[in-house]
UniProtKB/Swiss-Prot annotation:
Family: Belongs to the GrdA family.
Organism: Alkaliphilus metalliredigens (strain QYMF)
Biological role stated in the UniProt entry: In the first step of glycine, betaine and sarcosine reductases, the substrate is bound to component PB via a Schiff base intermediate. Then the PB-activated substrate is nucleophilically attacked by the selenol anion of component PA to transform it to a carboxymethylated selenoether and the respective amine. By action of component PC, acetyl phosphate is formed, leaving component PA in its oxidized state. Finally component PA becomes reduced by the thioredoxin system to start a new catalytic cycle of reductive deamination.
Gene that this polypeptide is encoded by: grdA
Covalent S-S links between cysteines: none
UniProt keyword list: Oxidoreductase, Selenocysteine
Domain of life per record: Bacteria
Protein name as catalogued: Glycine/sarcosine/betaine reductase complex component A
Active site, per annotation: 44
Enzyme class: oxidoreductase
Length: 158
């Protein structure tokens, strides 16, 4: 059984990293339903924090589908930006500016370059859509940051 079987997936891509449509393409055939997908400019938002509209969307979709059924996939270009977004959907908005301030959703959250995502999707499609970005992103730093956030704040340890 895949990590994505029957899950409602929220995709937050990055203009300078991995865009939403690339991750959507990878998820086809995984049993996941993409319920929201956007491509943001992570460095454009205040201090790299998650866009307030996206925070509201994540909160609303989590209320609708229940936290155990929701998975967030990020495409941030930098480990720090990925970490801030991951912290926002697990422990609440660390900048205390948005709708998720103080809201601990504890959602499953992964970056598109992490093995949990990469191993769950079609390898050929992944290579076409994301493979090139692996060469320019600091994959090890992103994996470490995401893992740390999940271990510290994630409610679901599967």
């Amino acid at each position: 059984m895949s990590l994505f079987d029957g899950k409602k997936v929220i995709i937050i891509g990055d203009r300078d990293g991995i865009p939403g449509p690339a991750m959507e393409e990878c998820l086809k055939g995984t049993g996941a339903e993409v319920v929201y997908s956007s491509t943001e400019c992570f460095v454009u938002t205040a201090a790299g924090a998650m866009d307030l509209e996206n925070q509201k969307r994540v909160m609303d979709l989590t209320e609708k589908h229940n936290a155990e059924n929701v998975v967030v996939i990020l495409g941030a270009a930098e480990a720090e930006a990925a970490g801030l977004a991951a912290e926002t959907v697990t422990n609440g908005d660390p900048t205390f500016a948005g709708p998720l301030a103080g809201v601990q959703l504890g959602l499953r959250v992964y970056h598109a370059v992490e093995p949990q995502f990469k191993d769950a999707v079609n390898a050929e499609v992944y290579e076409d859509q994301i493979g090139m970005m692996e060469m320019v992103l600091e994959v090890d730093a992103i994996i470490e940051e995401m893992s740390n956030i999940r271990n510290e704040f994630g409610k679901f340890k599967d």
